[in-house]
Structure formats: structure tokens, C-alpha cells
Regions:
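Short Lys/Arg-rich basic patches
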Residues: 1-6
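Nucleic acid-binding interface residues in structured DNA/RNA-binding domains
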Residues: 7, 31, 53, 75-76
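The conserved cystathionine-beta-synthase
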Residues: 7-22, 51-68
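Major-groove DNA-recognition helix of helix-turn-helix-type DNA-binding domains
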Residues: 17, 24-26, 32, 68-77
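Short beta->alpha transition motifs characteristic of CBS
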Residues: 28, 35-45, 73, 80-95
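Disulfide-bonded cysteine-rich modules in secreted/extracellular proteins
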Residues: 47-54, 100
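Short coil/turn motifs at helix boundaries and re-entrant loops, enriched in small/polar
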Residues: 70, 86, 101
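Juxtadomain coupling helices with adjacent low-complexity linkers
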Residues: 95-101
Length: 101
């Protein structure tokens, strides 16, 4: 079973999702049952366009759309917290509908 979160759930609990990512988990974000992005830990030395978590939360839909083209580094007080990245083409989801709530 993979870590899958719906966009609506992410909007309500961004901090909890980032704590999970900080512990090393990768989370697949879905909208209407289809994967739209992944939220993963930041690799050492990795650099991307930086967006604060507050801005990400306010502009979640736009951030997900931008992440289709290129990864975005989410920052917390200026430090890299996670990466919002495109969905890998070979990703196969295994989840139950209850996981999306």
C-alpha cells in the first residue's frame, strides 16, 4: 500500500504531510483518483525553484500544475522541506478509496 493523499486532504493537513515527508516518506497526490504529483524528501544538494509552504498552501492548485513541468522545492523558514515533483510515468497506484479522505 502506498502513501496516497487527495488534494483536498492535503489542503487541510499540509503540515502533517510535510512531517511524514521529513521522516522519509514519499506521498502520491491524487485528484479524482488520478495521480497529479508526488511529494518527496529533498535529496542532498538538490536545488529547484523555491516556494514557501505558506505560499504553496495558498496556491495549491497552481503549484501542482507547475510541478507537472518541473519540480518545486517547498521551504519552511527558508530551509528546504520537501519537493513537489511530476508523477513518474511508470507509477502504478495501489490504494483504497478510504485513503483519499
Amino acid at each position: 500500500m502506498q502513501n496516497v493523499i487527495g488534494i483536498r486532504t492535503l489542503r487541510r493537513s499540509v503540515n502533517e504531510a510535510l512531517l511524514r515527508v521529513a521522516r522519509g516518506e514519499t506521498i502520491v497526490l491524487v485528484r479524482h483518483g488520478h495521480p497529479v504529483a508526488i511529494l518527496r524528501p529533498l535529496a542532498e544538494g538538490e536545488t529547484h525553484r523555491r516556494v514557501s509552504v505558506t505560499t504553496f498552501r495558498r496556491n495549491l492548485r497552481r503549484a501542482v500544475l507547475v510541478s507537472h513541468r518541473r519540480p518545486i522545492m517547498l521551504t519552511w523558514y527558508g530551509d528546504g522541506a520537501a519537493v513537489l515533483a511530476p508523477v513518474p510515468p511508470d507509477l502504478e497506484l495501489e490504494y483504497e478509496e478510504d485513503d483519499l479522505r
